[in-house]
Amino acid sequence: MKFTKSEALHKEALEHIVGGVNSPSRSFKAVGGGAPVAMERGKGAYFWDVDGNKYIDYLAAYGPIITGHAHPHITKAITTAAENGVLYGTPTALEVKFAKMLKEAMPALDKVRFVNSGTEAVMTTIRVARAYTGRTKIMKFAGCYHGHSDLVLVAAGSGPSTLGTPDSAGVPQSIAQEVITVPFNNIETLKEALDKWGHEVAAILVEPIVGNFGIVEPKPGFLEKVNELVHEAGALVIYDEVITAFRFMYGGAQDLLGVTPDLTALGKVIGGGLPIGAYGGKKEIMEQVAPLGPAYQAGTMAGNPASMASGIACLEVLQQEGLYEKLDELGAMLEKGILEQAAKHNIDITLNRLKGALTVYFTTNTIEDYDAAQDTDGEMFGKFFKLMLQEGVNLAPSKYEAWFLTTEHTKEDIEYTIEAVGRAFAALADNK
């Protein structure tokens, strides 16, 4: 494939947009550099770039596009909303209908509030938890991404008995001191941190199924023990289901795993491709939010008719019988094929999969936490990524990200992808 127009467009973008991209994850810095491919249109499971190259898409916009690109039911809903006016600044029937749909899907949501992104949703759940508990410190798990607000851009200190350090320039040390970061899937370290800091902790942020250093499931009993220990400390449990809600099961990870949080942050899939976020939880906690309570949150675009219409339409599609079973079936087929190709070409990989999402790590180690995910071959992944791009298979340009299937992928798409993986692995083996 040739990428002449993408390269020219990136050169122009560098003159006008910081780094040439509007999110750093879109750059190719983590896969050896070069101009990122600029897409022109998408339909179903496919992309076409500005040079006319066609791809099978496993990026799915980092998760939201579960129904494929330009799904007709969602497109019709967005078009109708646009014709009626996309922003009112008033209550609408659409936001009430959508809130009811979310509550029916996720019983832990007694009350809901819409915002404009997953970052906003997480940021506000933290504020609400602090208001409810009267405490200030937050706990999170290492490597789990909860958006780009200051409180969650914090890395672990030197151990569970130390406070965090800023993970980005511009995050003050004073804010990092309010965050305790511990390893995922490690109850003993969590207990040690709670023994020291629990009386100051307002809440713990949890990705119930990790999606930001690859797909990593909790060990059996881990989430139940997190709930027990955190509640014993008088703190709240916040589930960040921005990636997981409606991705693995209609009712989210909390329904799939049978564990209930106090507050939940939502985003990505629930917007049907448009900007959205939402948060909700127990009635007595959510009533801390203005205008009922003292925790302030507002938004000009929050609950806008276009996003509400798109979200409603997306959930209507996902209610169709058999879609999640299809995603699981195709995911299993893809997993089997990739592992067979790795064995055939003597390529060392570990593959983590849950239903229609998976991550290929270039390592032989088991991946259960962030340290293990970091200790994988990023250079090898970068080469693999570029080879797959030439094969017409679009992946996320990072060794940490997942492959996301959509309801529009077919068995033929999976078969082609497995063949492409085989050719890529053969090329990697030849250049070892």
UniProtKB/Swiss-Prot annotation:
Its cofactor is pyridoxal 5'-phosphate. The modification N6-(pyridoxal phosphate)lysine is found at K268. It catalyses: (S)-4-amino-5-oxopentanoate = 5-aminolevulinate. Its EC number is 5.4.3.8. Its main location: cytoplasm. The keyword Cytoplasm applies. One of its GO terms (cellular component) is cytoplasm. Keywords: Cytoplasm, Isomerase, Porphyrin biosynthesis, Pyridoxal phosphate. It comes from the Bacteria. The keyword Cell membrane does not apply. One of its GO terms (biological process) is protoporphyrinogen IX biosynthetic process. Transmembrane segments: none annotated. It is found in: Cytoplasm. Pfam families: Aminotran_3. GO terms for molecular function: glutamate-1-semialdehyde 2,1-aminomutase activity; pyridoxal phosphate binding; transaminase activity. Pathway: Porphyrin-containing compound metabolism; protoporphyrin-IX biosynthesis; 5-aminolevulinate from L-glutamyl-tRNA(Glu): step 2/2. PANTHER family: GLUTAMATE-1-SEMIALDEHYDE 2,1-AMINOMUTASE, GLUTAMATE-1-SEMIALDEHYDE 2,1-AMINOMUTASE 2. HAMAP family: HemL_aminotrans_3. Belongs to the class-III pyridoxal-phosphate-dependent aminotransferase family. HemL subfamily. Homodimer. This is Glutamate-1-semialdehyde 2,1-aminomutase 1. It comes from Bacillus cereus (strain ZK / E33L). The lineage of its organism: Bacteria, Bacillati, Bacillota, Bacilli, Bacillales. The gene is hemL1.
